[in-house]
Each structure stands twice: as structure tokens, then as C-alpha cells.
Curated annotation (Swiss-Prot):
Keywords carried by this UniProt record: Ribonucleoprotein, Ribosomal protein, RNA-binding, rRNA-binding
Pfam hit, one: Ribosomal_S11
NCBIfam families with a match to the protein in the record: PRK05309.1, uS11_bact
Domain of life according to the entry: Bacteria
Any one Gene Ontology cellular component term annotated for this protein: ribonucleoprotein complex
UniProt feature coiled coil, ranges: none
Protein name, UniProt field: Small ribosomal subunit protein uS11
One Gene Ontology term of the molecular function aspect: rRNA binding
Species assigned in the record: Verminephrobacter eiseniae (strain EF01-2)
UniProt similarity note: Belongs to the universal ribosomal protein uS11 family.
GO BP terms, alphabetized: translation
PROSITE patterns documented for this protein: RIBOSOMAL_S11
Gene3D superfamilies, per the entry: Ribosomal protein S11 (3.30.420.80)
InterPro entries assigned: Ribosomal_uS11, Ribosomal_uS11_bac-type, Ribosomal_uS11_CS, Ribosomal_uS11_sf
Amino acid sequence: MAKSPVNNAAQRVRKKVRKNVADGIAHVHASFNNTIITITDRQGNALSWASSGGQGFKGSRKSTPFAAQVASEVAGRAAIDQGIKNLDVEIRGPGPGRESSVRALGALGIRITSISDVTPVPHNGCRPQKRRRI
């Protein structure tokens, strides 16, 4: 049996709620393959986010510092629209987009109050993967 056409009222589109938040946290996840930037308020509610792959970079170009810079600018502009003025930056991961993403946020005029490295380090937990042989 064929499905009936969906009502427009049933398709709810959530409107962006503009919050007025002055201070926030920028979570930069820099892996070897991609860089993801999420800007949250102090409680951890996401205000904006962007990734290198989401900005049109594909394959090995996602992991470049320039791709991380572009993603940071997009996330930063959206956060400025939400009222962000001060940011604490938490960097996670060893990727090449670590530094350039922080510089891009600072260049937008956002005051960076602290930069901290929160990369998870095991206290000799799980056995690591075998060595790559190229």
C-alpha cells in the first residue's frame, strides 16, 4: 500500500533559538583525519559547531591546518551571532589543526581566556593497535 503524502504541519522545522551567552568553551577535536570545532556555553549546551569535512574538504585535505582554520571561522561566526565574546579553548587530539583553529578563533575578535590540552592519555590501559607497516 502506498504511503499518503506527508502533511506540512507534521514536518516540524526547529527554528534557531538565539541565545545571548557571553562566555563559552570551544572544544577542538583534532584527529589525524579531520578537525571538529564545537562551541558551547559553560553548561555544555552546543551553540555552534563546524568540521573540516563539512566545509567541503574531502580526503586528505580535511586534515590540513587550513581546513581547520576555515571550520573554526564558520563555528566562530555562528557563536558571535549567539553573543559569545570570551572563550576557553579545550584542545583534544594530536592532529595538524590544533594551532590554526585557535588562531582563527582569536582573529575573529573573540577573546581567548585560556587554552588547555585535554587529550585523553591512558594510564597503561588498553593494548594499542599493531604498528603500521608501509
